[in-house]
Amino acid sequence: MRAKKSLVIAAVALPLAAALVVTLALTSKHGSTEPRAFCWGQLSRRDLGQLSTGKGGGYSAEDEPRAYYSGYQKRKFPLCNISQGGAWMAEISVRPSLHNSPWGSDGLDRRAVYESAAPMPHGITGWTGIPHKPQWPSAQLLLPEACREPFRTGDSDVQLRVILRNRQEERWSDTSTRERMTHIATKVGDHLTRKYKCGDENWQKKGQGATPTSKFEHVDPANVCRLRDLKVFTEPEAAEQVRQRTAGTIEDTWSCVTVLDKRLQEQTSTDTGATLAAFTTTRNPHHLTEFKEAHGSSTSGKGFTARIVRCGSREYLLNAKYPVPDKSDAGKFGEKNLLDGETLYADFERAFKQRAQCAG
């Protein structure tokens, strides 16, 4: 009887010991039972470390779905909130498109966004933004059109967003922040397209590194936006009051924005009251198709002119944006010191074709 009782105790003890070994194996060096994978099992502790401005672990994540209305129907979309040490650190979400792509049709008349936006590398319809305080850095990309059906978004694209809930500049550089956000967005994007069988983009491979971006710099009045012979000002002296910022690659997806220097020095939030002329190019097929369906080969409006331009075998969407005369600082400065909108666009197209070595 005693021997039988010993066998029972041993049988119970062995699974408990095994469970203890597993628990210890999963325990981090900080002594916690922190998970090894987060956000639908796609992100590692190392991945989350790329989003953090703190040190150590203590990560947790909740990946409950969030409800949005798609048409008249209430739908649930993936959402993951990430915390470190109990403090909210980042959010990864999927939802119907916000129609806010800086290089898409919905961005034709927007200028201020280019103070912080930069396109993701070639082959990805997405962008990163690191705006002025108090806003947060973000990365956003559009999933392939085939993903509309499984997500049931109708005619709207499916948009993936990564938003960081803390400032990065004290630990990470601008370029590093964009690279790290792109890494997370493309990793989750690849997972979603595989899971829902709506694309095989291999974004993570395409998204290594970041597109070139510059800090705000002085303007050469004879070569604005680093484009040879692009002139924006009625008098060269006006350039002394202006700074410019470029992002991306002009032969692919690119932008340049000019801003009143005094407003930059005030460190105000991004707003159209400070933004002067902005110029963009893209050969992204998604944006070209979207533009053609909405506008044909060209369109213009209050403060912008946009056209499809052929360069050899490639097509580009070019857009020149400019302030209209009003009581804002940009409106008053532009009326006095900037060339008219028609001339700005014509000079920009000419300078682009020269830079891209377009035939004809």
Give the positions of each predicted feature.
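Detector for methionine-enriched segments
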Residues: 1, 89, 120, 141-142, ...
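Intrinsically disordered, low-complexity segments enriched in small/polar residues
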Residues: 2-3, 69, 152
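Hydrophobic membrane-insertion alpha-helices, especially the h-region
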Residues: 2-27
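Generic detector of bulky aromatic hydrophobic side chains
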Residues: 6-11, 51, 177-182
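Extracytoplasmic low-complexity, Pro/Thr/Ser/Ala/Gly-rich segments
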Residues: 25-107, 200-260, 335-339, 345-360
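Short, structured coil/loop segments at alpha-helix boundaries
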Residues: 45, 173-177, 284-285
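Short, solvent-exposed recognition patches
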Residues: 57-133, 236-326
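A short, solvent-exposed beta-edge/loop patch
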Residues: 126-196, 292-360
